[in-house]
């Protein structure tokens, strides 16, 4: 069982590396600007992959980037099929990662609390 888990993690890491390169070098959509992939979760059967990303800008920029990534998902999946060797290349679902933003807010709150003490 642990062997299957480690393979899933390795596949997710490989997908993250390859997608980062593809987004940087192949996607020409102006909506997809500075995107950082923060993680990938792959289902056990490798049918689906949640790709977590962050981007610079406000809420309207997040919406534009998400639309651009969803539009490019089919292209990215086909390019990914040529880069990695899997029987089934997972369908990509892009999800904005709010953890970085939440971490910055918590850090700011801690700094304010320490400053008052």
UniProtKB/Swiss-Prot annotation:
Cellular location(s): Cytoplasm
Chief location category: cytoplasm
Keywords carried by this UniProt record: Cytoplasm, Ribosome biogenesis
Plastid is among the record's keywords: no
Listed Pfam families: RBFA
GO CC, any one term: cytosol
InterPro entries for the chain: KH_dom-like_a/b, RbfA, RbfA_dom_sf, Ribosome-bd_factorA_CS
Molecular function GO terms recorded: ribosomal small subunit binding
GO biological process terms held by the UniProt record: maturation of SSU-rRNA
Keyword Secreted annotated: no
Quaternary state and interactors: Monomer. Binds 30S ribosomal subunits, but not 50S ribosomal subunits or 70S ribosomes.
Family of the protein in this entry: Belongs to the RbfA family.
Xref: NCBIfam families: rbfA
Functional description taken from the UniProt entry: One of several proteins that assist in the late maturation steps of the functional core of the 30S ribosomal subunit. Associates with free 30S ribosomal subunits (but not with 30S subunits that are part of 70S ribosomes or polysomes). Required for efficient processing of 16S rRNA. May interact with the 5'-terminal helix region of 16S rRNA.
Protein's recorded name: Ribosome-binding factor A
Lineage: Bacteria, Pseudomonadati, Pseudomonadota, Betaproteobacteria, Nitrosomonadales
